[in-house]
């Protein structure tokens, strides 16, 4: 566990053979927010640390970028500990989760939707990260100016607790057709991202980025 930026805690695992780092985040505010659960094994590992940080507070929201085991594989573990937690996800993910046995509260969001709570204001950005290039979500917390990028802006290497510096526009320009294999959707996404002005990119994998 690392305090990566202001009230943002990072929980990570590095997989040496792949030189790949997987992160989850806890944004500490009046309504605490978890970004990604990790796999079931990761969730069971980080849950005691999260409970310690919350000091009796209830976990209010879990943000899920897209349907993948490292994003939402541990949902049931968190729902068991926090039965009223609300999973915030894409419309596709909201339809799929019950089919995998998840019966918790779900809130579906899409491009330009907002979610305001105690201590946070979230804006949602569509990006084609779900099966068959359907839209998943990235998240922008407007008060802290943190952009949660999901799998959009990833790098390889041991990035546990580490940050790097870069320019926001350069990070957007680096999103290519290998990442988003549809030119039209890529252009729409890049135009949408240029409307934001984050101070930090909290990546799903790799080094968090402090924006110059």
Where are these regions (language model features)?
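Metallo-beta-lactamase
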Residues: 88-211
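Short, glycine/acidic-enriched loop or turn micro-motifs at the edges of active sites
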Residues: 39-40, 69, 154, 208
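Conserved beta-strand hairpin/beta-sheet module of binuclear metal-dependent hydrolase folds
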Residues: 2-51, 137-150
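Short catalytic-loop micro-motif centered on adjacent basic/acidic residues
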Residues: 33-36, 61-65, 124
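Hydrophobic/aromatic beta-strand patches that form the interior of the parallel beta-sheet core
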Residues: 9-11, 63, 88, 125, ...
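Active-site metal-binding motif and surrounding structural segment of the metallo-beta-lactamase
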Residues: 42-88
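Short, basic, glycine/proline-bearing loop/turn elements
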Residues: 60-62, 119-122, 170-177
């Amino acid at each position: 566990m690392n305090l990566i930026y202001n009230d943002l805690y990072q929980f990570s695992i590095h997989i040496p053979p792949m030189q790949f780092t997987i992160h989850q985040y806890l944004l500490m505010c009046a309504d605490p927010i978890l970004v990604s659960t990790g796999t079931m094994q990761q969730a069971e590992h980080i849950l005691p640390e999260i409970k310690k940080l919350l000091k009796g507070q209830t976990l209010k929201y879990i943000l899920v970028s897209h349907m993948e085991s490292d994003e939402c594989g541990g949902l049931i573990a968190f729902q068991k500990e926090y039965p009223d937690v609300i999973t915030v996800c894409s419309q596709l993910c909201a339809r799929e989760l019950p089919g995998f046995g998840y019966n918790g509260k779900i809130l579906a969001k899409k491009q330009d939707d907002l979610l305001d709570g105690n201590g946070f204001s979230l804006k949602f950005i569509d990006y084609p990260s779900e099966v068959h290039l359907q839209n998943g979500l990235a998240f922008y917390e407007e008060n802290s100016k943190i952009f949660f990028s999901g799998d959009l802006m990833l790098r390889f290497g041991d990035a546990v607790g580490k940050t790097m510096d870069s320019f926001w526009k350069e990070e957007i320009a680096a999103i290519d057709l290998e990442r988003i294999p549809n030119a039209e959707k890529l252009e729409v996404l890049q135009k949408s991202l240029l409307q934001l002005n984050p101070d930090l990119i909290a990546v799903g994998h790799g080094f968090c980025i402090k924006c110059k």
